Amino acid sequence: MDPKAGGGGEEDDCVDSGAETGGSDYSHLSSTSSELSVEEAQDPFLVSIHIIADPGESQPLQEAIDNVLAWIHPDLPLFRVSERRASRRRRKPPKGAQPALAVVLFLQEEYGEEQILQLHRTLQQPPWRHHHTEQVHGRFLPYLPCSQDFFTLAPGTPLWAIRPVHYGKEIVRFTVYCRYDNYADSLRFYQLILRRSPSQKKADFCIFPIFSNLDVDIQFSLKRLPCDQCPVPTDSSVLEFRVRDIGELVPLLPNPCSPISEGRWQTEDHDGNKILLQAQRVHKKFPKPGRVHHASEKKRHSTPLPSTAVPSHTPGSSQQSPLNSPHPGPIRTGLPPGHQQEFAGRANSTPNPPWSFQRSKSLFCLPTGGPSLASSAEPQWFSNTGAPGHRASEWRHGHLLSIDDLEGAQETDVDTGLRLSSSDLSVVSAYSAPSRFCSTVETPLPSERCSSHWAAHKDSREGPLPTVSRVTTEASWASLPFFTKRSSSSSATARAAPPAPSTSTLTDSSPQLPCDTPKVKQTDGDMPPPPGSAGPGDNDMEEFYI
């Protein structure tokens, strides 16, 4: 079969970045992941999406997303659904508005057309709803009539689409639609944040490789819209990127970038899409479970951290990064080519706003260090030794996080920028320890369809995964049951239940580990408003906390 069959036709004819199948010339690099470096391929959560739901709607939306992603892999938490404190009035979008964010799933065609059609039927059931069908004007028409349909979960959330893969791997692709005039600037912007160049690049489309292993690719792409189309930012979704050397990155960004917590910064791209930057804590040491109490006692008598200003980088500067980076000074070698001179000029001319953080006990996040962290500190997507049950147990019991160790994230409202007190923190990060990894009982997959699909088309690929670019055991991540045998008649090795809606505040009088069943206080509409929040007249103001 011609690899472009169903691929959207000529290069400039198709607006949809996902119209090209996984086997087209746009994404042929999905079969050449060995060319990626370890740093580029080792973090599957380099890009994630926060979905912001109205009160009471987070759980069904989270389950709907998990059920769809289970067709790619049942333990791939790339999306976190959180709730607002109160519903908001929706502004009617302009006619023909194009949401700026989309998620495209490429499924293997060789396992049968019925599998793709079955998932397509799932996307036609609530809470999913049909959004639009893309019109293809190229020389080749898609052989599956559903391959140009787009769906959505709720207003202001990303579009979703299903595409067949003629050859290569299954793919999860995040797509940002750009204004025609802003495409080149957006390309440079995301190239700077992702610290890499696109693997495929055309006049109106490019692909950044995010993560790759034996069966799955995670990609980030940009699509240039025609002049007469304008992307609308998804006001109920926020893209989040893990970044390194935040102090070096901030002066290079085109729009203001402000800290909303100790580890997160907020900015916008050229089209007004909100972006969260999560700073990686390189070489962060986590106390052992037996020493948590001792560490907390030590911290009670320690002096608070002084206010730290973003360093003004000048040639020869050796100041340490604000996030305790082990490097003696700014590392410009990691920047994409062409940004070194821009960094030197803008760092000297841009004022550096001071920032400081207070410590609280309301937030815990997954460690975000580099490959030199201890193997028990990060999920392992490359090493796959041992029995599946042993790997799952090892992840649950070995990946314990100390809330006391991660004290100190005074958060601010993502949309308003208003600073919140510790009692107002009501949403756990997309990188928090999911409850399914803390539970010792495994439950079946959300649907029997997903279980049978996994067993039908994954059994032939079981076994240890090869390391990428000779990853050593010390640099590998803590065991995550990535490829485990699933069967429609067995639920012993199925995915654990999805986490509850992230609308709780951790309350504790002494430090506890997240998996040690901390006390949880549910927060509803009676939660006190954050300090300095808007009055009753500002009901449209976003109330989502990261």
Curated annotation (Swiss-Prot):
Residues 304-324, 347-360 have a biased composition (Polar residues). Residues 286-302 have a biased composition (Basic residues). Signal peptide: none annotated. InterPro entries: FAM124, FAM124_dom. Residues 24-36, 488-511 have a biased composition (Low complexity). Residues 1-37, 286-360, 488-546 are annotated as: Disordered. It comes from the Eukaryota. Belongs to the FAM124 family. This is Protein FAM124A. It comes from Homo sapiens (Human).
